[in-house]
Amino acid sequence: GGPGAVFWMWLMAIVGAASAFIESTLAQIWKVRGKEGEFRGGPAYYIEKALGHRWLGILFAVLLILCYAFGFNGLQAYNACSALEYYVPDYNENGLAMIAGLLLVLMTATVIFGGQKRISVITSIVVPVMALAYIAIALWTTISNIAWLPAAFAVLFESAFDFESIFGGFAGSVIMLGIKRGLYSNEAGMGSAPNAAATASVSHPVKQGLVQSLSVYIDTILICTCSAIMVLIFYVQDPAVAVGLNGMPLVQMAVNNSVGVAGIHFITFAIFAFAYSSLIGNYFYAESNFRFIFPESKRGLFAFRIACLVAILYGAVNSFDLAWNLADIFMGFMAIVNLIAILLLGKWALLALDDYSEQKSKGLDPVFLASSIPGLPKTDCWHEEHLKDFGSGPMKEYLEESVDMDFAGLK
């Protein structure tokens, strides 16, 4: 999208934090328990349970599966493999992309056939470590080239407000590209992140809504800006070379410009780690929605997993533009369905926020009960018999369990 798209990504993040709060709070309110005790939820679930339209929930689930299992996962596979271009410029022609794609498929298969808990362990270790290291590299690159920073920001803002470019063809303008890339980076409003938010065990839905809002700032304002600043510094230093690069090779050369060859190796590993963890997370989103449509189909789930692995291999060896175009199309349809749902249901998230704020003002650790909001459509969780699920050990539950014990237990 060019340098100016970064500015519109920032604005998208600020607006998106609000929609991320609403959709993730709704996902928590209408989450359900799986057979193994895990929580599942997301737009498909709150559309069915709160709006009463299962057909619309199924439509959303199908769109999410197409977007994440086949659009975004193809893009992530491409990103991971394109990092090889620095080492082998013709990697796609000589079969190396196919080998790398098969390796990705094998690594992903070991996780998706191993269950959700293994997903959590891998992503919770890999992502924070690599994110912190990535930020450190970006800070070093920025500080070591501080004299070029004003020129980099000048290019960014000049491009962002190039009105001839903006209004010359709005659908392909810097604003639209910034919005689409911002939506891709933080998912806010699309209805994908709520699938992850619903799995959390918290004492109040609003707690997870606030966490999801924060995540929007972390990934778009912090992580993506790190990439942008490194690339823009490289661009103003050597525009002829920068213009000829795309995707991961552009980021690799931007780091090489400041850190040296070691920086390229780090970026290669970091991008592979980010892309791999994203493949796993995206698959989990898709599987949660597949289970919504076909809750009891074990054979169907096996076939679905195989199809997802084929999509990863396909993305690894196909073009950059195709991956982005598929992702953009499905992403737009997902957002339309989900935004309509959160406009209709947003009042319940705001009432939950009022309940949370009231408890916080009294110095309490907020605990949510569905009965605290009059008229709230039926929920599977958040009733008194589920207090033990909340994880905060409310006094009422403790006393009820203690009355049958001896005095020491009650004390």
Please give the residue ranges for each predicted region.
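Helix-loop-helix module between adjacent transmembrane segments
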Residues: 12-37, 43-44, 48-78, 82-111, ...
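Terminal cytosolic tails of multi-pass membrane transporters
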Residues: 339-411
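Extracellular/periplasmic helix-exit of transmembrane alpha-helices
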Residues: 21-31, 137-155, 163, 167-169, ...
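Flexible loop linkers connecting adjacent transmembrane helices
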Residues: 1-5, 20-51, 237-258, 288-293, ...
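Membrane-interface loop-to-helix entry segments
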Residues: 78-84, 95-145, 149-157, 290, ...
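Membrane-interface alpha-helices at helix entry/exit sites of multi-pass transporters
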Residues: 3-10, 45-49, 53-61, 92-96, ...
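Transmembrane helix-loop junctions in multi-pass membrane proteins
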Residues: 3, 71-81, 108-120, 140-152, ...
